Amino acid sequence: MKKFIFKRLIQIIPIILGITFLSFALMHTAAGDAVDTLYDSNSSGVSEQIKEERRAELGLDQPFMVQYSKWLKGVLTGDMGISYISGKPVFETFISKLPATIYLMLTSIVLTLLIAVPLGILAARYRNRLLDYCIRFLSFMGNSMPNFFVSLLLIYFFALKLKVLPVMGYGRSPLVSVILPTLTLTISMASKYLRQIRVTVLEEMNKDYVLGGKARGIRDNVIFYRSILKSSMLTIITLLALSIGSLLGGTAIVESIFMWDGVGKLAVDSITMRDYPMIQAYVIWMSFIYVAVNLIADIAYQYLDPRIRLNQED
């Protein structure tokens, strides 16, 4: 197990280096830069000389590889640079946005599991009955609607019509303001989880070990809760790994619509303003999160399924 974890950790280094280099290259091949965006949005009639002086101050006049090597050296020494727009340290700004994103992630994951797991199990156990049809219809509807559309619907009904929930924000009342963005994410995630859980449970119910258990006189509930659900956990872990990775990276559309002051909104604002150091910090964060979450998922697989453990040992 230790050898497996060490090997996966070593693999993180070239992956993150490759992703950061690619994102850095893409940003610098795009037309314009942070200076153009900053002065075009805040000032009028600014001379090219002033812009060039600002570029020299930020190091944007240097060759691409020089800029990348300086940035990489700073990251390796713990300095992620200064935001071009706010003038504040990138690391401090990024860390300050994480609590809001983590809070939204936790509420969405918990609510999704509370809804999707029992409904997915019920749909499988009552296959091709009225309850199954109703659950599958709800899942289909949830999958058919994009997050921005669900966000606007929830805002219209709960904030504008009923006026029972705030439209946006995070600071004043986090317990209340998190409801609408959480519902938006939950509708999308629960619909996907529900379908996958139903399919997985049905597959497990038709396997030989289930039929063998019934032949030996073991009760259906015992087989279901001790064997079928345990085997189905692998699917749930896979779904969680994908969801946690994307949610920790911030759901840009949902956070922007609800003005949720998290990592996703920060990334959108940084891309709009061409804030290269902040964008690179976001790229590093996303790369690390996806690799780390997948590593944790692989470790969980080995504990839940001995066959995977044996394959790793071989």
Briefly describe each language-model feature range.
Residues 2-24:
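Hydrophobic secretory-pathway targeting helix
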Residues 2-3, 94, 98-131, 172-314:
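Alpha-helical transmembrane segments of integral membrane proteins
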Residues 12, 97, 101, 137-140, ...:
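Residue-level signal for discrete positions within transmembrane alpha-helices
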Residues 16-69, 162-180:
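Hydrophobic alpha-helical transmembrane segments of membrane transport/permease proteins
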Residues 23-27, 32, 151, 155-159, ...:
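Juxtamembrane/transmembrane-helix interface segments of polytopic membrane transporters
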Residues 59-117:
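An internal, D/E-rich "acidic patch" concept
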